[in-house]
Amino acid sequence: MTNAKTAKFAWNEENTQKAVSMYQQLINENGLDFANSDGLKEIAKAVGAASPVSVRSKLTSAKAYQKSDKPRKVGGGSSIRKAHYVRVIAKHAIDSGIIKDADDLASLESAKLETLDAVAQLLGVADEVKQAAGE
């Protein structure tokens, strides 16, 4: 067993320039989405950086990082929110003359999502809720 310590990685002009040029080359060859995901991993390995996050941070401070145009979906959950259910149910209640204002049903947002889904299915508006949520 040896007590030799490995040198910690530190950004300098040389490895910063290498990271920037590799990043730009990856964008040209493989596109922005690849460069911003697997490309950052490749750059981290090539320059010896601790992580792709470190590379992204350095590219950002060097004003070389390009943010992707399309939004990423984070998490695996549904994009349907309680507000979508309440809006659609309230719209139908107003159209039917049952209530005058959507605020009359605002307290429905405190119900569980599964409960609102069951009510929407019962009322036959579940597909409309999905459309309102953009699914």
From Swiss-Prot:
Keyword vocabulary terms for this entry: DNA-binding, Early protein
Induction: Expressed pre-early in the viral replicative cycle. Expressed with a few other proteins from the first step transfer (FST) DNA. FST DNA corresponds to the first small portion of the genome that enters into the host cell at the beginning of infection before pausing.
GO molecular-function terms, A-Z: DNA binding
Its job: Involved, together with A1 protein, in the second step transfer (SST) which allows the completion of viral DNA into the host cell.
UniProt miscellaneous comment: This gene is part of the long terminal repeats present at both ends of the viral genome and is thus duplicated.
Subunit annotation: Interacts with A1 protein; the two proteins form heterooligomers.
Record-stated family: Belongs to the T5likevirus A2 protein family.
UniProt name for this protein: Protein A2
Source taxonomy: Viruses, Duplodnaviria, Heunggongvirae, Uroviricota, Caudoviricetes
